[in-house]
Amino acid sequence: MQVQILRMSRALAELGVRQQVLTVGFPGLPRVRRDSENLVVRITRAPLPRLRSRITGLVGLNQAWLAAALTECVKLRRRWPADLIQVHLDGQLWALLAGPVAARLVGVPYTVTVHCSRLAVYQPMSTVDRIQHPLVTAVERWALRRAAGITTLTERTATVLAAELGAAQRVIDVVPDAVDPDRAEAAPAEVERLKKRFGLPQEGGPVIGFVGRIAHEKGWRHAVQAVAELADAGRDFTFLVVGDGPQRADMEAAVAEAGLTDRFVFTGFLPNDEIPAVMTALDVLLMPSVHEELGGSAVEAMLAGTPVAAYGVGGLCDTVGKVTPSLLAAPGQVAELARTVKRVLDDPAPVLAELRAGREWLADEFGVHHAAGLALAHYERVLGKER
């Protein structure tokens, strides 16, 4: 989500939209960075004890962000007057509270981008999450009804929210995750360097990948099970895991317990400008997500010419399902997902032809400049309504 926010913020800055982005950030980054003339990124995170969480990474991380972000709003309201507050929702409680409270503090309306909605696609991630799910769902409904506008990543979620909110919310627009089609596919030299760096086969054995946050909702357990099924079938391959997350140690332990350590390569976090080389290097991207609002990684992979084998959940039905529908497996069906990967490896030509045919649609629908234009139109619509 943070990659998408930064990409969209930069595109909006090019269109002349002045922005102050308040984000939890990553350790080691500067507290304030002027990214461009119209874009300032501020890390807002109150001090908190380093207690590990298998959901957020650190216990209290979201609360620490909210407290610091609201404090920053108070500081900014006089020296940097804003027209609108934009909040990005991830299905968790604290971001839902940010919009209404910040809007009151600053005295301007707020709009929200729904990256993950409990009303539409979200699936609880733990016992505690299941217990609090009805409460957080109610808070989401409350926050969305009070927003001056809403953007969703898909028509699917927009339709659900329109039905849920009714006349209380009339400004709902679709602004999908954005990619840069011109940079989606890496040059052969970049791919070769990446393969050499991580000890991947230069030729011959296929590379299957998992790219993203290593957390429950991304379905990493299903990825390990699918790899086990492929290994049992005698397939020769390397499985590349790109990314980090609160459950990385759990995934590594599960891989070792399954006797698959020699099949896996973990890269840890990689900068976003290295992802095109990753996607181009893969023969198949595996996305066994439990829930997925859109699935920007799938779009990036397909634009790089890489097939995506995924569960048919959320927005993956609208991306993978439109371009290569035969690569969607029923949610939770690991054996079917493994068979899908095997089919692509055995006979990639039909799927690659579908990807070539679908590239123009992907570039038009998810290109960053197109998405930024939609976002700007949404802001103008919201402010026109408010004024």
Swiss-Prot record:
Pathway info: Antibiotic biosynthesis; kanamycin biosynthesis
Gene behind the chain: kanF
SUPFAM superfamilies named in the record: UDP-Glycosyltransferase/glycogen phosphorylase (SSF53756)
EC number per UniProt: 2.4.1.284, 2.4.1.283
Classification via PANTHER family: SULFOQUINOVOSYL TRANSFERASE SQD2
GO biological process: kanamycin biosynthetic process
InterPro entries assigned: Glyco_trans_1, Glyco_trans_4-like_N, Glycosyltransferase_grp1
Gene3D superfamilies per UniProt: Glycogen Phosphorylase B
Example GO molecular function: 2-deoxystreptamine glucosyltransferase activity
Superkingdom, natural source: Bacteria
Family stated for the protein in its record: Belongs to the glycosyltransferase group 1 family.
Enzyme class: transferase
Stored Pfam families: Glyco_trans_4_4, Glycos_transf_1
Catalytic activity: 2-deoxystreptamine + UDP-N-acetyl-alpha-D-glucosamine = 2'-N-acetylparomamine + UDP + H(+); 2-deoxystreptamine + UDP-alpha-D-glucose = 2'-deamino-2'-hydroxyparomamine + UDP + H(+)
Keywords of this entry: Antibiotic biosynthesis, Glycosyltransferase, Transferase
Protein name listed in UniProt: 2-deoxystreptamine glucosyltransferase
Job of this protein: Glycosyltransferase involved in the biosynthesis of kanamycin by mediating conversion of 2-deoxystreptamine (2-DOS) to 2'-N-acetylparomamine using UDP-alpha-D-glucose as sugar donor. Can also accept UDP-alpha-D-glucosamine, but with a much lower activity compared to UDP-alpha-D-glucose.
